[in-house]
């Protein structure tokens, strides 16, 4: 007779910012728990959640600002009944969630059944779910210490944001990355891509190639129809890559949005960056995230609505200016930015979160 196991439901869906921290945690605790994953149809979940986890999906949509918004919220609300059914059928002992609109009905369903919930908030400014439903959770885990200021009615614990194992390992540069003597730039817009960053970059691509920069451009899955065909030995364009840790560890500069996951990856790898926050993020949280690095001189923050081609190019020229020292380029500004990033604390947060999750293990 097989030994009875504890059942953990992970509710994480939508963007890499929600999915990747949950994946890092699930890998740490999978030996002790049977993992069931609650996601949303037609999102990134099916691509990244391993088949060994029991992936369950609900047909929900992100509430948009249109005449159907009320119906979309009602659909999320009514999904509580489906989630209650799942929690009962799978005999769930604990729920772990990383925010997003899948989290709210999951927290309410678990609360109804008196199942404990652990919620992780990776942004500096807490999202809507954390703000309004965090008090219902057993613990709210924080990616940044200062987030505690906004959550006085929650049981908070600072753990940092869990990253995938590859960020704690030394990874060689992928073979498909351009080789050469020029500095390596990584341009990306998060797991879904960023159309505006791509457009800003395309305007300056000729300039960048002439400067002998090597470029890896991650355009995002949602922007595959906006490919610009540009041939150069120093330029590679990809929809997505699972080797992002390797790229960040071996590059000179990252140009990116400023989701919480990206900020933590930059801190872990110690890489300077140009951060272009998504201007329509909830509570302007991406700009607040970016300021964690820009305020200490570890990143340059650019306002999307104020970037010009000239300003973008001049900024790159200035920070990538180098002097030859013993035959090797020395990037004085980048080196200073790297030193500034070292002042920030990093935690192997997956170990801390594992301890908290395993606190709820039941003996059978």
Curated annotation (Swiss-Prot):
Keywords: Cell cycle, Cell division, Cell inner membrane, Cell membrane, Cell shape, Cell wall biogenesis/degradation, Glycosyltransferase, Membrane, Peptidoglycan synthesis, Transferase. One of its GO terms (cellular component) is plasma membrane. It is found in: Cell inner membrane. GO terms for molecular function: UDP-N-acetyl-D-glucosamine:N-acetylmuramoyl-L-alanyl-D-glutamyl-meso-2,6-diaminopimelyl-D-alanyl-D-alanine-diphosphoundecaprenol 4-beta-N-acetylglucosaminlytransferase activity; undecaprenyldiphospho-muramoylpentapeptide beta-N-acetylglucosaminyltransferase activity. Its EC number is 2.4.1.227. The keyword Iron does not apply. Signal peptide: none annotated. SUPFAM superfamilies: UDP-Glycosyltransferase/glycogen phosphorylase. It is a peripheral membrane protein. UDP-N-acetyl-alpha-D-glucosamine binds at residues 15-17, 123, 164, 191, 286. Disulfide bonds: none annotated. Pathway: Cell wall biogenesis; peptidoglycan biosynthesis. Cell wall formation. Catalyzes the transfer of a GlcNAc subunit on undecaprenyl-pyrophosphoryl-MurNAc-pentapeptide (lipid intermediate I) to form undecaprenyl-pyrophosphoryl-MurNAc-(pentapeptide)GlcNAc (lipid intermediate II). Belongs to the glycosyltransferase 28 family. MurG subfamily. PANTHER family: GLYCOSYLTRANSFERASE, UDP-N-ACETYLGLUCOSAMINE--N-ACETYLMURAMYL-(PENTAPEPTIDE) PYROPHOSPHORYL-UNDECAPRENOL N-ACETYLGLUCOSAMINE TRANSFERASE 1. This is UDP-N-acetylglucosamine--N-acetylmuramyl-(pentapeptide) pyrophosphoryl-undecaprenol N-acetylglucosamine transferase. It comes from Prochlorococcus marinus subsp. pastoris (strain CCMP1986 / NIES-2087 / MED4). The gene is murG.
